[in-house]
From Swiss-Prot:
Organism: Syntrophomonas wolfei subsp. wolfei (strain DSM 2245B / Goettingen)
Protein name listed in UniProt: Ribonuclease 3
This protein's record includes keyword Cytoplasm: yes
Chain segments annotated as transmembrane: none
Enzyme class: hydrolase
Amino acid sequence: MQNERRIAQRFLEDKQLPYSSNELITMALTHPSYAQEKNTVANNQRLEFLGDAVLNLVVAEYLYNHYGRKAEGELTKIRAKVVCEDALAIFARNINLGQYLLLGRGEEMSGGRKRKSILADAVEAVIGAIYLDQGLETVQRFIIRQLEELISETASGDYYDYKSKLQELVQARDKENVSYAIIEESGPAHAKVFVAGVYYREQLLATGEGKSKKEAEQKAAQKVLQDNLVPGT
């Protein structure tokens, strides 16, 4: 149990999250396969259940407060896109959640750290843990910090997830992943410009520029798709 607690502690410190105890985060990072293998009761499924409800509440309240002119039906569609499995898997990747997960050997060997369903479930479990440990205000900041840009893009109708589409195409061919890195950053603090590169097996496929790291990565993935640079095509 000591090793599990150390991993949870590292996650909390790396993400600069306040906490009173790391017990809940340890549970949030524990996939059922690990709990079964180690013969422990605590896994992240109950926290996932709670986190799902908290996530929907936080996003719904944010939409209600920031998009007063949109009708109920529009708000429901926006929320659905923002809290779907694909969006939550991106959330998880943006905070490198996969590297902290406690997985059973079978899940580990089959690529569970990169599996969308596992990542999305773990995000919800972490949200549930933060809510129980620190309350609604803290978990609101954690969620909105990661989803605000996606909410804005989705609400404006401009959002298309090029990164997920590219990843799906690559994995369908050879089960590999593409990766992203910021290769240039310029401009003053209030008007930064980022250049991101998208890589496959350490080879640069394309670059993209944006006002945020996420936008630059999306632009890089978009260029790969539009210029037909997908590996294996």
